[in-house]
């Protein structure tokens, strides 16, 4: 999910719900399956009240912590080489690509927050359809993309294009990692390279969302549920990053494309069964 906004209300009722949603967030943020869709669908499946954008932010702070801890050396190298060597090295090019690629997502998120909250977050059917559609696109990109280029061969323009794809992730069901990984595969990046670029590109946009929201937050927002959700998302997110990067050394994204289709089908079936 791409989070930019200033909504500060809305929390699960119990710490247990917060932990469950934190684990869901940690799993779904880094897998191309849409964390925002799962944070809406899981409460809907279980009959809970919607958690709201404020709690979604709390969970994204958790996954931000996971990315920062896992990639702290990479983030430090990006900052140093980006400032000292500009675009003369692969790391420098990636750094400036991330800076430029973050802009579309930030602008789109700020402009579209109210529309997304009013339209997309309220429509379970729309979320299901987007899960399926992006799943098909991910399948095609993984199945037919060249997948030849490594991180050392990346261009600034590649990261900007991936950043444009990231802008679509403000819409639940699209998936920030799904959009960015799919774009990376379509541009010819190796599977593991596409994932790493996706994770690093997400760091500033999630940080920006936290910086915008937390200073204006109601102190009542910082409940035990908030901190339980953050911790659960951080721990599960770190584990998923490590596991996915190992898996992608030999595995593909096809399983996630099929999973998206399965979740979409189950969701539509439940909608029909409930007469909604």
Swiss-Prot record:
The chain crosses the membrane at residues 13-33, 52-72, 96-116, 122-142, 154-174, 197-217, 225-245, 253-273. It is a multi-pass membrane protein. InterPro entries: UppP. It is found in: Cell membrane. It is an enzyme of class 3 (hydrolase). The keyword Cell wall biogenesis/degradation applies. Bacitracin is thought to be involved in the inhibition of peptidoglycan synthesis by sequestering undecaprenyl diphosphate, thereby reducing the pool of lipid carrier available. NCBIfam families: undec_PP_bacA. Catalyzes the dephosphorylation of undecaprenyl diphosphate (UPP). Confers resistance to bacitracin. This is Undecaprenyl-diphosphatase.
């Amino acid at each position: 999910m791409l989070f930019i906004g200033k909504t500060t209300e809305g929390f699960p009722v119990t710490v247990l719900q917060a932990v469950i949603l934190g684990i869901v967030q940690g799993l779904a943020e880094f897998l191309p399956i849409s964390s925002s869709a799962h944070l809406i669908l899981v409460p809907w499946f279980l009959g809970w009240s919607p958690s709201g954008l404020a709690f979604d932010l709390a969970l994204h702070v958790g996954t931000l912590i996971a990315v920062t801890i896992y990639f702290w050396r990479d983030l430090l190298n990006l900052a140093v080489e980006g400032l000292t060597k500009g675009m003369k090295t692969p790391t420098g090019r990636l750094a400036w690509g991330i800076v430029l690629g973050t802009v579309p997502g930030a602008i789109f998120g700020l402009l579209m927050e109210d529309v997304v909250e009013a339209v997309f977050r309220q429509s379970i059917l729309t979320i299901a359809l987007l899960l399926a559609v992006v799943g098909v696109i991910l399948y095609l990109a993984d199945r037919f993309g060249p997948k030849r280029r490594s991180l050392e061969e990346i261009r600034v323009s590649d990261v900007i294009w991936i950043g444009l794809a990231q802008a679509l992730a403000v819409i639940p069901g699209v998936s920030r990692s799904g959009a960015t990984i799919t774009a990376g595969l379509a541009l010819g990046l190796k599977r593991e390279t596409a994932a790493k670029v996706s994770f690093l590109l997400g760091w500033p946009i999630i940080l920006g969302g936290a910086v915008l929201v937390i200073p204006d937050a109601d102190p009542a927002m910082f409940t035990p549920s908030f901190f339980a959700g953050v911790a659960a998302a951080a721990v599960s997110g770190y584990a998923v990053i490590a596991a996915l990067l190992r898996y992608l050394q030999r595995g593909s994204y096809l399983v996630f494309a099929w999973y998206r289709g399965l979740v979409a089908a189950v969701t539509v079936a439940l909608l029909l069964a409930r007469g909604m």
